[in-house]
Design a protein with these regions (language model features):
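N-terminal Rossmann NAD(P)H-binding glycine-rich loop of SDR-like oxidoreductase domains
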Residues: 1-26
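Mid/C-terminal beta-alpha module of Rossmann-like enzyme folds, strongest
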Residues: 15, 206, 213-260, 301-303
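Catalytic helix-loop patch of NAD(P)-dependent Rossmann-fold dehydrogenases
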Residues: 88, 92-96, 103, 107, ...
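Amphipathic terminal alpha-helices
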Residues: 285-305
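Rossmann-fold cofactor-recognition segment
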Residues: 38-53
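Glycine-rich Rossmann NAD(P)(H)-binding loop
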Residues: 189-194, 219-226, 278
Length: 305
């Protein structure tokens, strides 16, 4: 089997390559079909997924069985001021990959986000794959357009929405909170935006379980359990052992101090219903996955040996 991983330098791409290389994750083994897979990892500048001709030629030349698209413009605030760049990476890129995958018969795994939802229809119920999206930010809008292109142009697709991703590698909320706690000793974090923290280990594991099947469609894949950013930050500080206080604030209070920030959904909790009903949901409770992260994290070096 031949697999192409786009955007391999990011959090998820790095973790997927690690699991393919080692044949397993913290959760369990990867599918047997992937143990001797040929893996082609590509990122900018070698492949710009927003360039149709470049994508078409690259996919036709390599003829993969599976394409896992981890490439995206994920800076939520940056998307508000760089609309064209966000559209090219988050919408045109997936369109180009979908068309190339359809031509060559490849399966396409496309990673999306909880930010396709408005978060306004609360009720305390996690949103499953049947919930109608309604993005309130440029990031969410461009990611939703990418989903639609994948659905339209490639019938062998897996669209996998995730949320609040962190990993041993790259920049993420966990590392930001740890570093800010060390630097300032006191943090204010919003307590009225709720979702599902997701360890990249869990997401990569589930993607690799899915990609060898024919269970095509839309999936949610996030850490089990729901919390606010304040709850998440408090648990990060507790597990890290950093001597810092975490205080709650509202979204409105945060926005007043950071008027340039994009609107974010107040309720974007996802339900992994499709995973449970198809290949099985091995995703850990967010607290357990976070504790495991701190047990293995080696600071700037990534993961402990």
């Amino acid at each position: 089997m031949k697999i192409i991983v786009t955007g391999y330098k990011g959090q998820l791409g790095t973790e997927i390559l690690k699991q393919l290389r080692e044949g397993r994750s913290e959760i369990g083994p990867i599918p047997e079909k992937l143990l001797n897979a040929t893996v082609i990892a590509v990122d900018l500048p070698d492949l710009d997924i927003s360039n149709y001709k470049m994508v078409d030629e690259f996919i036709r030349r390599n003829r993969p069985d599976v394409i896992i698209n981890c490439a995206a413009y994920t800076n939520v605030d940056g998307c508000e001021v760089n609309h064209d760049a966000a559209f090219k990476a988050n919408a045109l890129g997936p369109r180009n990959l979908a068309q190339a995958a359809e031509k060559t018969g490849a399966r396409l795994v496309h990673v999306s986000t909880d930010y396709v939802f408005s978060g306004r229809e609360n009720g305390g119920v996690a949103q499953d794959e049947a919930t109608i999206p309604g993005p309130i930010s440029a990031y969410g809008s461009t990611k939703l357009m990418g989903e639609k292109y994948v659905e339209q142009f490639c019938h062998r697709h897996f669209i996998v929405r995730t949320a609040w991703l962190y990993s041993y590698y790259g920049k993420n909320f966990v590392k930001t909170i740890v570093n800010a706690g060390k630097k300032f000793g006191k943090l204010e974090v919003v307590n009225d935006q709720c979702g599902n923290p997701t360890n990249a280990v869990d997401l990569a594991h589930e993607i690799l379980q899915l990609c060898v099947t024919h269970e095509y469609g839309l999936y949610h894949c996030t850490g089990e359990g729901i919390c606010s950013w304040y709850d998440f930050a408090s648990e990060i500080i507790r597990l890290s052992g950093v001597d810092a206080a975490v205080a709650p604030c509202t979204s409105e209070e945060y926005k007043a101090k950071h008027p340039e920030s994009a609107d974010r959904p107040k309720w974007s909790a996802l339900d992994n219903r499709m995973l449970r009903c198809t290949v099985g949901n091995d995703v850990r409770d967010w607290r357990d996955a976070l504790a495991c992260f701190f047990a293995h994290w080696d600071g700037d070096n990534g993961m402990k040996d």
